[in-house]
Amino acid sequence: MALVVSVLSVWGQGCCADTVTFAGRIENAEYQVWIEMDFYHNDVVTPGQEIFGQVPGYFGAKRDTRKWIFVDAEVKGKQARLVITNDYGSEDLEARLTLERDGTYTLERLKGSTMKIVVGGKWVNIPKKLTFKRPVATDPTA
């Protein structure tokens, strides 16, 4: 009886809450961009932007040193609502990140500024909707 009560007590405290769906790195190969995130602990430090401290995450690009910083993230099920600002604080937007049934993620701008990156000295607008995937782990011994 005590074991049942103990197990129910732990279960009731949310022992098995999701802490991985919106944590880690996801990538978009077409635009060569990625998202680094931990919406559960809000403990991501943006490289080169340490002045912001720990944040829920950021959007980075392989060909641009600028970052779009996630200043707020609210997770509800398979979706996260985000408040994002550029690293100068001059542009911001609200977006939604959704885990799709096929395991991909969709970032959708809901309102506000269009995200942009620099490629070859020219500004490139990021589409209103963009699909991301988790990177494939490689075996270093292979």
Predicted feature descriptions by range:
Residues 1-10:
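Bacterial N-terminal signal peptides
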